[in-house]
Amino acid sequence: MTDNELLTIMRKEKIEPCYYKIYGVGGPIFEVVYHLEHKGNKYRLLITERAEKIYDKDFDTEDEACKNFLMEMSDVYPELKKYI
């Protein structure tokens, strides 16, 4: 899975962009935000609550990072589970 595929899923499922940031694409920061970042040769998933990190994990591949992003968000948006 790639970032573009992940963005397509988020839009298809009508997940408001204010709750996520994928490589800088997303809305303003709300209470809980899921961030997908690309740093060097690693991919990072951060989850922040009120601008405080509550989850921070690095991945070797974009596919792993995107799937983990969906897995974490599926706790709040169960409709995302079908993409994992």
Task: Tell me what each language-model feature is.
Residues 1-28, 83:
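Negatively charged, low-complexity tracts enriched in Asp/Glu with abundant Ser/Thr
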Residues 27-54, 72:
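Short aromatic-glycine-(Arg/Gly/Cys) micro-motifs in beta-strand/loop hairpins
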Residues 57:
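Phosphoinositide-binding peripheral membrane targeting modules
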Residues 60-75:
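A short, charged, amphipathic alpha-helix used as a generic interaction element across diverse proteins
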Residues 76-84:
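Intrinsically disordered, low-complexity charged/polar segments
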